[in-house]
Amino acid sequence: MRSIFKTSLIACATVIAASSAFAQKAGDNIVSMGVASINTDTDVGPLTNSGQFTPLLVGSTANISSETTVSFGWLHMYTDNIGAEFTLGLPPTVTQDLTTPNGGALGTSHPAAAKIELWTPTAVAKYFFGTSKDQWRPYVGLGASHVSFHNIKAKQTADVQALAGTSAALSSTWAPVYNAGLIYNIDDKWSINGSVSYIPLTTKATFVGDAAHGTTTTTGDIKLKTTDYVIRLGYRF
């Protein structure tokens, strides 16, 4: 009986020791995969048109759809508390609605006026609180994202084609990333990472349309304030 009890104590001690040897320590690399929910608030600045549409575009607003996509991450720990993570998601296609309250002949409501493919590769430096033996590791991060817009397709309606039927472009830009999150270490290999990021940016919009009186170009700044919610399953090696 004493031998069995002693063996049980040793087994328990081994389990406890193993469970305390979690992750996020100097030299660790953690790859992860999960989902990201992308939510964007849009602020359209004054739009200028080379033709007769400028007065019709005063007060224009836009709304970009929220989308969910697959997210990948690679985290490298330089110390037990400092790491850097590179993330990239499968580029989601977002839908942009446009409202022109003074649109007149253009109309005032243009749902699904354009579809846009969004790329946001991101690098973030992170500070992890606690120690490498903690099962829960909250963190804060600061980084940058290169945001670019591809395969922009304008809706095939007369009003939208008059504004952007020939071409539509949004300039690529670098944007700051403010990040906070929490890692739960399942064991010394597997973990769950949940985070939220805020990415504010300004992009230059250039739309070329084919109106009845000829080709016109519309330009203006669009401010995007994006909040990303991410959860991923990670593996340390």
Functional labels for PLM-detected ranges:
Residues 1-27:
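Cleavable N-terminal export/targeting peptides
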Residues 22-73, 228, 234-236:
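Short glycine/proline- and aromatic-enriched beta-strand/turn motifs that initiate or cap beta-hairpins
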Residues 24-28, 39, 72-156, 224-237:
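Gram-negative (and chloroplast) outer-membrane scaffold detector with strong preference
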Residues 43-51, 96-105, 150-162, 205-213:
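Outer-membrane beta-barrel translocator domains and adjoining extracellular loop/strand segments
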Residues 56-60, 106-114, 161-168, 215-221:
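Extracellular loop and loop/strand-boundary signature of outer-membrane beta-barrel proteins
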Residues 62-68, 115-120, 168-175, 221-225:
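Short sequence motifs at beta-strands and strand-loop junctions characteristic
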Residues 93, 186-237:
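Predominantly the C-terminal beta-signal and adjacent terminal strand-loop region
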Residues 129-193:
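A charged, solvent-exposed segment within the mature domains of Sec-exported extracytoplasmic proteins
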